[in-house]
Regions:
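C-terminal ends and interior cores of transmembrane alpha-helices
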Residues: 37-51, 239-252
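Transmembrane alpha-helix termini and helix-breaking/packing motifs in multi-pass membrane transporters
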Residues: 46-48, 105-128, 196-199, 301-321
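Cytoplasmic helix-loop-helix junction between adjacent transmembrane helices
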Residues: 59-102
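Helix-loop junctions on the cytosolic side of multi-pass membrane transporters
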Residues: 128, 132-153, 331-338
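Juxtamembrane intracellular "pre-TM" segments in multi-pass secondary transporters
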Residues: 141-176
Length: 338
């Protein structure tokens, strides 16, 4: 199982930036459609060939599909809003999308249980195939604004697209800030462990994790309001989030779940605003590529969370929150208008 997860992770890392380039040079909408088809293919492989070769092949195509969505999704939404003069609404739209991604896990988990009882593994597999294909069909309906030629940002190859992220004024620091900030989201993998350590009964651990997820959804949904706060607010909220995370971990009581929940809500509010600030800085012709560069950084930064947890648990991860705050302050501040 670990080998399969590693294969999935490596595939996503290797495909992250190239798929962003593909979306920029071909079609962001097309990339989303292709992602849905590939993810459906992954479920087909897992359903008809549930052995090691089938699962390995499925994880490869699933990893490529996930990478296709990573940069293309945000780029398509931002440029679509910009085309109608509504780019200022992106943070609210992105926050609502992030919140929905968390909330939809609840009914899908319940439905999966019903499907398993009704038809077992195969029924769940084919239902997943149908869902992915339906998502691909829906993606064909997304509006994609026509490409506008930009004299100083021509259609660029991979190397020049990446160098854009590294050299454009104000963009490199934003990419770094979002990469490190996004990597902190790996803490969600440990919420069940934290709940057990806080004394939550084993049977109630899923409910405790659900509380944290709901708080995260609320934070993401309120990101639009957080975006209007003073410049110091984002790093301040991140520091507060880290403090609550540490306090919740050190307080060995089930009520500490509330502290972790508020921590996660604050964190996701900051993350959504940060990702929106990055989009404000990225030139349109390479938007998906640069977003994918940040996504690659997020995957790398998540390793810091895993390492910190191994060294000192949640309090050590909280230190990463504190270390990230200055990066957020520097990389995600709004440019001064003169």
């Amino acid at each position: 199982v670990s080998a399969l997860f590693a294969l999935w992770s490596v595939t996503g890392l290797l495909a992250e930036v190239p798929t962003g380039v593909l979306a920029d040079r071909w079609s962001r909408r097309g990339a989303l459609v292709l992602a849905g088809v590939l993810e459906a293919a992954g479920f087909v492989l897992w359903t008809v060939a549930p052995g090691l070769p089938g699962f390995a092949a499925g994880f490869v195509v699933w990893g490529i599909g996930g990478a296709l969505v990573s940069g293309a999704g945000e780029a398509l939404v931002y440029d679509g809003l910009a085309a109608v003069g509504a780019e200022g609404s992106y943070v609210r739209v992105h926050g609502a999308t992030t919140a929905t991604e968390l909330l939809v896990q609840v009914p899908t988990a319940l439905l999966a249980g019903v499907l398993v009882g009704a038809g077992g593994y195969e029924l769940v597999g084919w239902a997943s195939v149908a869902t992915c294909l339906a998502a691909a069909a829906l993606a064909t309906r997304f509006p994609e604004p026509p490409r506008t030629g930009d004299d100083d940002e021509p259609d660029v190859p991979l190397r020049r697209a990446v160098s854009t992220a590294l050299r454009r004024p104000g963009l490199r620091s934003a990419v770094v800030a979002v990469a490190v900030l996004g990597g902190l989201d790996a803490i969600e993998e440990y919420f069940p462990v934290m709940a057990r350590e806080q004394g939550v009964a084993t049977g109630l651990v899923p409910a405790a994790v659900l509380v944290v997820a709901l708080a995260g959804a609320a934070g993401a949904a309120l990101a639009g309001r957080a975006a209007g706060l003073p410049a110091r607010a984002l790093p301040g909220l991140l520091l507060l989030s880290g403090g609550l995370l540490a306090a919740g971990a050190l307080w060995g009581h089930p009520a500490a779940v509330a502290a972790v929940a508020v921590s996660y809500g604050l964190y996701l509010a900051v993350l959504v605003v940060g990702e929106a600030r990055l989009q404000e800085r990225v030139p349109g012709p390479v938007r998906a590529t640069v977003t994918s560069v940040a996504g690659l950084g997020i995957e790398a930064a998540s390793l810091l969370v895993f390492g910190a947890w191994a060294l000192g648990g949640a309090p050590a991860v909280a230190v990463l929150f504190a270390v990230t705050a200055p990066l957020v302050a520097r990389g995600l501040r709004r440019p001064v208008v003169t």
